[in-house]
A protein has these predicted regions:
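Short beta-strand-to-loop acidic/aromatic patch adjacent to the donor-nucleotide binding site
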Residues: 64-75
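Active-site regions of enzymes building and remodeling cell-envelope glycoconjugates
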Residues: 49-57, 67, 87-91, 107-108
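Catalytic core and acceptor-binding pocket of nucleotide-sugar-dependent glycosyltransferases
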Residues: 117-207
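N-terminal anchoring/stem segment of glycosyltransferases
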Residues: 1-56, 60-65, 187-209
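Short, solvent-exposed loop/turn segments at secondary-structure junctions
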Residues: 11-13, 44-45, 74-75, 96-99, ...
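Conserved donor-nucleotide/metal-binding helix-loop-beta segment in metal-dependent transferases, i.e.
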Residues: 76-110
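Hydrophobic/aromatic beta-strand patches that form the interior of the parallel beta-sheet core
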Residues: 7, 38, 68-70, 89-91, ...
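Long, low-complexity, intrinsically disordered polar/charged segments
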Residues: 1-25, 85-89, 120-121, 132-150, ...
């Protein structure tokens, strides 16, 4: 198996002004830790939100010891540690959610009982925890009915369902939090111009050359 792959979604040349700032940094970090970089630019799940395309990792990441999913609006300092230096039996993420706040109960959430859900913006998985990328066996319309707040969260529903269904252990992914920053560009209420200026300011603040 290859060591690792970093996967990032950018469909239909999404927000190029921001991605021109963030993607080179993500790619440079991937290179620094000896990982391949996979830009998910072609949809394979028609009718689903763009963020669900991360489940292409189920197939494209099958040949790797580690898979790292990072949203395109994440600023990564290329000097960030190698996050694959971790216990492969644990799925790791940069943000957690309370299951009962975002998703309706089902047999897997109730049986698991932990109430742990993961934000899908930064997820680290290994060959041992690859089940976290199992695509849903239902339509988008059916999946959306499981989401309490926003049907766009079907991606996070799928991740969280797999955590409960397979009993996957969870923890944080990054030790040095000062070397990552999530712009959270979707639904933030800011203009594209303001988002780009925020990204530039954060990159400067983080001392990234």
């Amino acid at each position: 198996m290859k060591k690792a792959c970093v996967h990032t979604i950018q469909l239909n040349n999404w927000f190029p002004e921001l991605c021109d700032l963030t993607l080179p940094l993500i790619q440079k970090w991937a290179n620094n830790i000896g990982a391949d970089f996979n830009l998910i630019s072609e949809p394979k799940f028609p009718g689903w939100p763009a963020n669900y395309e991360r489940f292409q990792i189920w197939e494209s990441g099958a040949g790797y010891e580690w898979n790292i999913n990072i949203d395109a609006d994440f600023i990564i300092n290329p000097t960030l540690e190698d996050v694959t230096d971790n216990d492969p039996s644990i799925v790791r993420a940069e943000a957690y959610m309370h299951t009962d706040v975002f998703f309706y109960p089902n047999q897997y959430f109730l049986r698991d009982g932990r109430g742990i859900s993961m934000s899908d913006n930064f997820i680290l998985s290994s060959w041992m925890t690859h089940d976290v990328w199992t695509p849903l066996q239902m339509s988008y319309e059916e999946a959306a009915k499981h989401c309490i707040k926003d049907s766009r969260q079907v991606s996070e529903f799928a991740v969280s369902l797999n955590i409960a269904r397979y009993g996957l252990k969870c923890s944080g992914a990054v030790k040095d939090k000062n070397k990552t920053y999530h712009i959270q560009s979707t639904g933030c209420g800011k203009s594209k111009e303001d988002i780009v200026e925020l990204a530039k300011a954060k990159i400067k603040e983080m001392g990234i050359q």
